[in-house]
Every structure is written in structure tokens, then in C-alpha cells.
Amino acid sequence: TDELSVLEHLKHISNDEFLQIALDGATTDHVLSSQLEHVSEEDTHTVLSVGGNDLLNNISFLTQDFRYSPNRVLEQLRQMLLPINKNYEAIVQKLTDYRATPLLCTVYEGDLVGSEEFDSIAESARSMVSFFNDSIYRIGSKYNIEVLELREIFVTSEDYANPIEPSHKGGQKFAKEIVRWVDNE
């Protein structure tokens, strides 16, 4: 079967019009500096799924040899996440300027266990994702915006094409949740 992207799945299962402004590899910096300008007043819904690449760009944090107390390590993690969290909230704040109803998506955990590149940090990466997702929930609550929990959608290895990217099946599940959300709005 052909491997469809989330956008292709959306177009296949819904008669609504969809525009993807996300770029592969984009971070919260990219979204703030160049992607939000593509949101228009005609849009009725926006889906924000960003932050995973920011975490991926900081994955080396998990391989550091810390000789600190757990408190100090957690403080280091908080400091590392701070600019990402600030960017994320700035994006959400800008999205509230548009008439489109936003949906925030948590960062999924990836299929890291057993992968050559990420197996040794799979569990700590899951914790790092949880710390960031906590910020997404907090920001969603602050701005009264619904949050879609991607960790409940991407649950098996079949949902991933590789340790990081969703597969055809995972993308289809994500698209179905987006359509369900749009239809229930």
C-alpha cells in the first residue's frame, strides 16, 4: 500500500479543505519566525503539533554524565525546556488572534525502545517528553484550548515508520482524530 502523510489521510477521509503549513524538522523557533504568517482569517480550525523537534535537537541532554543531585538535574532540564515552553506559549498566544479554533497536540514518545540510535535513552526520553507535555496542558488550560493526547494515538510500533516518524497507520489514526475534532466543533 502507499504510505500516506497525515495531510493525505485528511484529504482522503474528509470533504473539508486542509492546508499543511508545517515543515518537516521545524522547531518552535521556525513556527514563530516564518510559519504563522500562513494562517489566515479564512481558516476555521488550526492544529498545532510542534515541540518534538525542539526536544530531538536537545536529546544530547539525556546522554550527559551528570554528577549532580536529582534536584540539580531536574533544574537543568527545566532550564533546557524554558525557551521551548516560552516559544510554544508565544505561538499559542498568536493563534488566539485568529478566528480559527485551535487544537494543541502533545508530543508523542516515538518508538525508541530497541532502536539502535535511541534505545539507551528511551525511558529518559519518555520522561523529557512528559515534562514538555505538561507545559502543553498548562498552556491549553490557560488559553482554554483543547489538547489532543498523541501518546494515546501512537501506541504501538506499527504506528511508527521509524523511531521518530509516524507510519501510514499512525498518520491515519492521527487524521481520524483531527476529523473527529473538527466535526464535533
Kindly label every feature range from the protein language model.
Residues T1, T28, T106:
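Ser/Thr-centric signal marking residues that sit
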Residues L36-H168, Q172-E185:
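Alpha-helical cap/lid subdomain in secreted, periplasmic
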Residues G25-S34:
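Structural motif
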Residues V6, V31-L32, G170:
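Residues at alpha-helix caps and immediate loop-helix transition turns in enzyme cores, especially N-
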Residues T1-D24, H38-E42:
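Serine-esterase "nucleophile elbow" of acetyl-processing enzymes
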